[in-house]
């Protein structure tokens, strides 16, 4: 009997600790997800990285420079969005995480080019003209997704906020007329 009580107390304590851990992890999980504006920023950065690798590998400096000039503001805003994501999710290690991601992104595009071999330039150089045809950051992000531009980011999207529930009428209060 005494043994059963001790076992129940231990089990109850473990359940309490598990519940507290889950409560504490909730905000951390929410912090590590990707906001919609951050998703756009990461997509734009992936396209920029793909075009940068293509410019270097395929001697398309003029096209890349035209892309950077046209979208200078959007590219800078996207970089700031990525910085903000890593500040939010990595705290004091944000700069190291940001640098690591940008390096990983460039390496992924470079490896993609190596795998494509002699087909890389013919397949990639049309992207310059198509990217330059976009008019804003949303167009660039959509273009990136439509073209399946490689992005090694695995962070899940944040869940959408639930819509607010309508207020309940107080007892004795009649519903509003429609």
Kindly label every feature range from the protein language model.
Residues 25-27:
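N-terminal signal peptide c-region/cleavage motif recognized by signal peptidases
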Residues 2-16:
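Bacterial N-terminal signal peptides that target proteins for export
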Residues 15-23:
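Sec-dependent N-terminal signal peptides
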Residues 37-95, 103-107:
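Short N-proximal segments of mature Sec-exported proteins
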Residues 74-177:
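Compact alpha-helical subdomains of small soluble proteins
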Residues 34:
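Active-site flanking loop/helix segments enriched in acidic
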